[in-house]
Amino acid sequence: MTKFSLHKEGLLTIGFTLACTAVAFFFVPALGLCGICVAALVTYFFRDPQRAIAISKDFVLSPADGLICKIENALPPQSSELVEEMQKISVYLSPLNVHVNRIPVDGIVRKLHYVPGKNLRADYDSSEDENERQESTIEMADGRNVVVVQQTGFLARRVVCDLRKDQQVSAGKRFGIIKFGSRVTVYIPKDMPLLVSEGQTVVAGETILALLSETASLVTERFLD
């Protein structure tokens, strides 16, 4: 059975919603019933389920739950200081998706860059350059880099990233959350064979986006986290 838990970032919001619901019940019971529905939705949003993480050094895992809305070749963010085009995979998260983000590859966090911005709808292409976002560059053991961009959306108002510069990270581990409807984009080297396509639904920490090389094996064990 999958363990149900809540992300720590949601505890204060859930507590505040429950407190408002209690007050509403005292003054206007009908409004309190509406508050229960809101509290249930907020609790559902901040769920943090266990995932069956692939144990392998040969994969790029999805950093987010959602729908792959675009795959293309593009230059990575300037903050990465990478000058060659990479494969860009964008995942759109609806308000109903799990919003906890997970590390796509093993490596070391080399660069972290926060960009303040707007809150346009995350499914608009223009939102990538204009919305608030967090850009994180991870260097793998072979010297290649992967860049992850957490981006807010129309409902999302805050990006949370728990990474530190020079931190050693493991694929599949939690590293942050985006609060309410958003987009996560991952940039990977062009020589990595892709295993996904546009329109595909992906699961953070479980779905394999790409192989690190042509000879990498898909056979792997998994652990719950």
From Swiss-Prot:
<comment type="pathway">
    <text>Phospholipid metabolism; phosphatidylethanolamine biosynthesis; phosphatidylethanolamine from CDP-diacylglycerol: step 2/2.</text>
</comment>
<dbReference type="GO" id="GO:0005886">
    <property type="term" value="C:plasma membrane"/>
</dbReference>
<feature type="active site" description="Schiff-base intermediate with substrate; via pyruvic acid">
    <location>
        <position position="182"/>
    </location>
</feature>
<dbReference type="InterPro" id="IPR033175">
    <property type="entry name" value="PSD-A"/>
</dbReference>
<keyword id="KW-0456">Lyase</keyword>
<keyword id="KW-0865">Zymogen</keyword>
<keyword id="KW-0594">Phospholipid biosynthesis</keyword>
<dbReference type="InterPro" id="IPR003817">
    <property type="entry name" value="PS_Dcarbxylase"/>
</dbReference>
<dbReference type="GO" id="GO:0006646">
    <property type="term" value="P:phosphatidylethanolamine biosynthetic process"/>
</dbReference>
<comment type="similarity">
    <text>Belongs to the phosphatidylserine decarboxylase family. PSD-A subfamily.</text>
</comment>
<dbReference type="Pfam" id="PF02666">
    <property type="entry name" value="PS_Dcarbxylase"/>
</dbReference>
<keyword id="KW-1003">Cell membrane</keyword>
<protein>
    <recommendedName>
        <fullName>Phosphatidylserine decarboxylase proenzyme</fullName>
        <ecNumber>4.1.1.65</ecNumber>
    </recommendedName>
</protein>
<feature type="modified residue" description="Pyruvic acid (Ser); by autocatalysis">
    <location>
        <position position="182"/>
    </location>
</feature>
<keyword id="KW-0472">Membrane</keyword>
<feature type="site" description="Cleavage (non-hydrolytic); by autocatalysis">
    <location>
        <begin position="181"/>
        <end position="182"/>
    </location>
</feature>
<dbReference type="GO" id="GO:0004609">
    <property type="term" value="F:phosphatidylserine decarboxylase activity"/>
</dbReference>
<keyword id="KW-0444">Lipid biosynthesis</keyword>
<comment type="subunit">
    <text>Heterodimer of a large membrane-associated beta subunit and a small pyruvoyl-containing alpha subunit.</text>
</comment>
<comment type="function">
    <text>Catalyzes the formation of phosphatidylethanolamine (PtdEtn) from phosphatidylserine (PtdSer).</text>
</comment>
<keyword id="KW-0210">Decarboxylase</keyword>
<keyword id="KW-0670">Pyruvate</keyword>
<keyword id="KW-1208">Phospholipid metabolism</keyword>
<keyword id="KW-0443">Lipid metabolism</keyword>
